[in-house]
Amino acid sequence: MFQRILVPTDGSDITAKAVATAITLAKLTGASISTLCVKEPFPYSAISEMQPVPPQEFYDAQERIAAGRVKAVLDAAAAAGVACEGATVEALHPWEAILDTAKQKGCDLVVMASHGRRGMAALLIGSETSRVLTHSPLPVLVVK
């Protein structure tokens, strides 16, 4: 049925449900999992000398947080006996990074949460999940 499942993570509680669902599906189908955490690019402004955090500090913090989120998925998969690989990537549009990663890794299913950390912004500009659903050539399982 499925051979490689992509489960993006942002560390939210709802994403933890998507991870658990992906692990269960992987166990049932013998699939492996790829996980991905998308980091936001540095928020440059017109007044660049007034940045509250230096760019390298921002990048280091983003990587540390993203790597921790990926490690949580890797640990959960390992505890369940499911093969899993993970990555972090910087992207302006997380949905594009999700679809690019799915293609690069040869995934045949994306399992993701119905919403993530963006809260009200997602209601105003549309969620990453809806963009993945709209543009994905693969099946997408949305977990609520």
Regions found by a protein language model. Name each.
Residues 109-134:
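Glycine-rich, Arg-bearing micro-motifs that act as flexible, cationic patches
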Residues 1, 139-144:
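Short hydrophobic/aromatic patches at helix-to-coil boundaries
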Residues 3-52, 76-85:
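Small/aliphatic-rich secondary-structure junction motif
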Residues 75-110:
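Structural beta-alpha unit
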Residues 51-54, 102-105, 128-129:
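Short, hinge-like loop/turn segments at secondary-structure boundaries
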Residues 53-68:
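A short acidic, glycine-rich active-site loop
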Residues 18, 45-48, 96-99, 122-124:
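Short, well-ordered secondary-structure micro-motifs
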